[in-house]
Amino acid sequence: MKFTKTALFTVLAATAFAAQAGQYPDLPEGIKAGAGALIGDTVYVGLGGTGTTKFYSLNLKDPKEWKEIAEFPGGKRNQPVAAGVNGKLYVFGGFQDTDVAKNQIINDAYEYNPADNTWTKLSTRSPRSTSVGASVAADGGKIYFVGGVNHEIWNGLFQDVKAAGGDKEKEKAIFDPYFNLRAQDFFFSPEIISYEPANNVWRNEGYFPYSGRAGAAVAIKDGKLLVVNGEVKAGLRSPGTALGTIGKDGVTWKKLGDLPAPTGYDKQDGIAGGMGGYTNGHYIVTGGANFPGALANYEKGIMDAHRTGGLKKTYHKAVYALDGKTGNWKIVGELPATIGYGLAVSYNNKVLLIGGETDGGKPLSAVQTMSYDGKKLTVE
């Protein structure tokens, strides 16, 4: 069945080395933890944590203004994922409040066709935990999903909270065991899954050997799938990065260097919700959020320091660049303000940062670009 009404997406950036006036207009509204993708010269973005069901588009060749496209028919969605394949936009999952309980993961898929401005609900669903927390990238007609939270554990948690009926002691008895689980006991998906829209087929592309992730930054270039950081349990991130080679029998992996500690910190706690992309042959990533000190506490056996240890959710602005030869990272600059959980797309040797959020979860509507030539970082 088809639906008509209106779609699109954003993020922010800038650096200490070069900052110029932005060349793209702000979004009509702030969008954080939404979904979007680049299709040809047009970027699409929408949904997310502000509760909007709208999507917007911007023609990057003639970027005068964002246009509202057909409204998403699947209702409000926080943290859905999306990708563009063969001229169409695909949106998967997310979580929403339902009659069953709040924050329920929705396992479904929609296709948007720009040619006639319509949405179609697809007759398919993810075979694993790729509906919330997964990261996606498209290549060769396939959409690759990396990680994702465990569907049963997540939904069950909020169903149990609803059953507690507002009793704070009962809620504490639900949340305490959950947050004290080890990372591996959250059962984030370690599988790499692909979806091929042309055939409506899901495939198992192998396993990510460095623990399941949620909210990692991912990118594909020349048959290589890059994974940067991500959450490994509630409140805990990984500083690790890895590069996978896509083959006919799935993806094989090579461990890369950890992200270095940002200025002012002794240790890199990893980031979730980072935004990155390729520019002039270089991959750069920025933003994201973590709980500084969580990793050190976890290594001491303190599982929920982000909740009980006084740690603060912290958004970041360091910009990291990958050395493709050594597999190591370095900091090449900073944005003028912190950001996370926005859309990043690569276009004309620049990385567009669209929307997102900053300190306190404030949604952002700005669109900025980053470019890096191996020596200088420029933010517009």
UniProtKB/Swiss-Prot annotation:
GO terms for cellular component: periplasmic space. Kelch repeats lie at residues 42-86, 88-140, 142-176, 177-222, 225-274, 296-349, 351-380. The keyword Repeat applies. It is an enzyme of class 5 (isomerase). It catalyses: N-acetyl-alpha-neuraminate = N-acetyl-beta-neuraminate. Its EC number is 5.1.3.24. InterPro entries: Kelch-typ_b-propeller, NANM, NanM_proteobact. GO terms for molecular function: racemase and epimerase activity, acting on carbohydrates and derivatives. It is found in: Periplasm. The keyword Nuclease does not apply. Residues 1-21 form the signal peptide. It comes from the Bacteria. Keywords: Carbohydrate metabolism, Isomerase, Kelch repeat, Periplasm, Repeat, Signal. SUPFAM superfamilies: Kelch motif. The active site is at 231 (proton acceptor). Converts alpha-N-acetylneuranimic acid (Neu5Ac) to the beta-anomer, accelerating the equilibrium between the alpha- and beta-anomers. Probably facilitates sialidase-negative bacteria to compete successfully for limited amounts of extracellular Neu5Ac, which is likely taken up in the beta-anomer. In addition, the rapid removal of sialic acid from solution might be advantageous to the bacterium to damp down host responses. Homodimer. Belongs to the NanM family. This is N-acetylneuraminate epimerase.
